[in-house]
Design a protein with these regions (language model features):
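Extreme N-terminal starter segment of soluble prokaryotic enzymes
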Residues: 1-4
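Glycine-rich beta-strand-to-loop/alpha-helix junction loops that act as flexible
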Residues: 9, 89-92, 208, 322, ...
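Short glycine-rich, Thr/Ser-proximal phosphate-binding strand/loop in the N-terminal lobe
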Residues: 12-56, 228
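Short beta-strand-loop/turn "lid" adjacent to the catalytic site in phosphate-handling enzymes
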Residues: 70-122, 143, 149-158
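Glycine-rich phosphate-binding loop of actin/hexokinase-like ATP-binding domains
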Residues: 150-254
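Catalytic phosphate/nucleotide-handling subdomain of diverse soluble enzymes
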Residues: 218, 224-259, 265, 329-360
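Adenine-nucleotide phosphate-binding core of ATP-dependent small-molecule kinases
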Residues: 265, 272-276, 283-318
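Internal helix-turn-beta structural module
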Residues: 298, 302-323, 332-396
């Protein structure tokens, strides 16, 4: 069975065609600058990337270009669109309505639209992608996989904020969490990799990318996570502030003469390690800067690592222990220095690190020593494969 996985942003679209029987990626790519001038990147398995400049006024034209590339006579991955058996869509926010993935129906889409307020930057783009696929691929079953769904098992004590309860009742203001597809995939995969029973386990997943979040997974269920109503809460990130004193918003607004949108723009796009360093949101640049003696780059790495360690410590308390810590995503998988700094704070848990293993790159690595009281792993995430698996499970 072939599943087309679609991840729509406001001006970009990522896609993969996955054979669910072998879990092989048949083709993948990216549409960029939708609504501007348009660029399609397409790569069939085993071949070089092809980049085509092409107008994409809307998401529908972008998806049409993807479908045309998939069946191209020379470089297509399939002979005809009849070989696409299902489509899996990433949907950022499912609110409280969706605790799991769902087959896309008119009723389901209406329920997703009701969550628009919770993710105004993402949900409209997700819906545009879904509707474009429905128009271009009528009759093909489609599934929505929600970033928030995995975290819907959190207890009330973890998701309620210390705000007037009526805001929760009226507006559903609460912690939702994000990156759920990744947290779910990695927690299941690390248990399998280590031969552990996930239903009798305490796992902390650190999804550290430009957007970063941590989750506490007790017996296979999420009991807490660092992102909140929006992806702005929690860890210090690439350009997002993470947790701050809320009164800073008023303070900065007055000092800098900004309105609420201006302050939110600073917190979302000009803060995090980029804001601290004044250099970059990319950890490769920060490491180079630190090695060259840039004190602010060094400070950014320290602040980031310290916040990760603090969250891990709090989730050890939330679960009354931990068996496994799994690092994943761009920084989690590729920045040994960050893992090393984070784990240095966690010696009290009886963690000992195999520095040689920590320096390696590759699939599924244990980086703790055999006598470490907590097993620490690096597990590459694969959100597209997770979406394909969810899609197959519902369509079959």
């Amino acid at each position: 069975m072939n599943v087309l996985v679609i991840n729509c942003g406001s001006s970009s679209l990522k896609y993969q065609l996955i054979n669910s029987d072998t879990e092989a990626v048949l083709a993948k790519g990216l549409c960029e600058r939708i609504g501007i001038d348009g660029r399609l990147t397409y790569q069939k398995a085993g071949l070089d990337k092809e980049i085509t400049e092409a107008p994409m006024p809307t998401h529908k034209e972008a998806i049409q270009l993807v479908l045309d590339a998939l069946v191209n006579e020379k470089t297509g991955a399939i002979a005809s669109l009849a070989e696409v058996n299902a489509v899996g869509h990433r949907i950022v926010h499912g609110g409280e309505k969706f605790a799991s993935s769902a087959v896309i129906t008119p009723e389901m889409l209406a329920a997703v639209e009701e969550c628009n307020d919770l993710a105004p930057l993402h949900t409209p783009a997700n819906l545009l992608g879904i509707r474009a696929c429905q128009d271009l691929m009528p009759g093909v079953p489609m599934v929505g996989v929600f970033d928030t769904a995995f975290h819907q098992t959190m207890p009330e004590k973890a998701y309620l904020y210390g705000l007037p309860y009526e805001y929760y009742e009226k507006y559903k203001v609460r912690r939702y969490g994000f990156h759920g597809t990744s947290h779910s995939f990695v927690s299941k995969h690390v248990a399998e990799f280590l031969g552990k029973d996930i239903n009798n386990s305490k796992i902390i997943v650190a999804h550290l990318g430009n957007g970063a979040s941590i989750s506490a997974v007790l017996n296979g269920k999420c009991v807490d996570t660092s992102m909140g109503l929006t992806p702005l809460e929690g860890l210090v990130m690439g350009t997002r502030s993470g947790d701050i004193d809320p009164a800073i918003m008023e303070f900065i607004a007055k000092k800098e003469n900004l309105d609420i949108a201006g302050v939110m723009n600073v917190l979302n796009k000009k803060s995090g390690v980029q804001g601290i360093s004044g250099l970059s949101s990319d950890f490769r640049d920060l490491e180079e800067g630190m090695e060259a003696g840039n004190e602010r780059a060094a400070a950014a790495i320290e602040v980031f690592s310290y916040r990760v360690a603090k969250y891990i410590g709090s989730y050890v308390a939330a679960m009354n222990g931990v068996d496994v810590i799994a690092f994943t995503a761009g920084i989690g998988e590729n920045a040994p220095i960050v893992r090393s700094k984070v784990l240095a704070y966690l010696g009290y848990l009886g963690i000992t690190v195999d520095e040689e293993a920590n320096g390696k790159r590759g699939n599924d690595i244990v980086i703790s020593t055999p006598d470490s009281k907590v097993t620490v792993c690096v597990i590459p995430t694969n959100e597209e494969l997770a979406i394909a698996r969810e899609t197959v499970a519902l369509v079959k």
